[in-house]
Curated annotation (Swiss-Prot):
It comes from Human herpesvirus 2 (HHV-2). The keyword Zinc does not apply. Pfam families: PRTP. Belongs to the herpesviridae PRTP family. Keywords: Late protein, Viral genome packaging, Viral release from host cell. The keyword Lyase does not apply. This protein may affect translocation of the virus glycoproteins to membranes. It is involved in capsid maturation. InterPro entries: UL28/UL56 (IPR000501). One of its GO terms (biological process) is viral DNA genome packaging. This is Processing and transport protein.
Amino acid sequence: MAAAPPAAVSEPTAARQKLLALLGQVQTYVFQLELLRRCDPQIGLGKLAQLKLNALQVRVLRRHLRPGLEAQAAAFLTPLSVTLELLLEYAWREGERLLGHLDTFATTGDVSAFFTETMGLARPCPYHQQIRLETYGGDVRMELCFLHDVENFLKQLNYCHLTTPPSGATAALERVREFMVAAVGSGLIVPPELSDPSHPCAVCFEELCVTANQGATIARRLADRICNHVTQQAQVRLDANELRRY
C-alpha cells in the first residue's frame, strides 16, 4: 500500500520557518560579535576575513528584509518579525563598529583603547533613554531604564493616544525602538543591567510557594521581595581536564 503524500506546508508556515532559521543564523553572528569584543583583539584580527564576510551578509539581509519588515509593522506586528528586525539592526551596528575598532587596533596596537571602545566605556549608558511624548494638553516625560519602563510607557500612550499628535507619538516610539535595539537586540537574554531587583521573577514566586507564609498572601510577600536571580553568579563546577579537552 502506497504511503500517503506528505501534507503541503502552508505559505505562512513556510515563511515563519524561514524567518526562524534566519533568526538563528543572525543570533549566531551576534554571539560571535559579543565574544570577539571581549577577547584579545589579536584573535579578532585572525578572523577578520570571516568577520567582514559576515558583516557583508548582514548588510545584504538588512537591505532586502527591511522594506518587508516595515510593511508588516505597518499592518500586523508579530513577535518574530519584531525580534528579527531588532536583531538585524543590532548586528549591523555592532558588526560595523567592531570592524572599525579592529582596524584601528591593527594600526595603533592599543589594547586598552580597543576595550574602551568595544565595551562602550567612554560612551553614555545606552540603557537610559529620555522619552518625551507630546500631547495637546502638555508633555509627558519619562526615562527608560528597564524593560518594564517600556511597558509602562506604552500603557500611558494607549491611555492618551486620542490627545497625542501622530508626529509626537512617532517621535516617542522611535526613542523606544532605539532603547529596544540596545536592550534586546543582542539576543533574547537581556543584559543584567536591565534587571530591576524590586520586580520579582518566576523563581521568586516558586520559592515563596514552598516556604512558610506566616499568614501572609503570595501577593503581599512578592511586593516585599528583592530579586537577585538574574544578577547573581551561577555556581558552575568545571573539571580542569574538561577545560583542556575543549
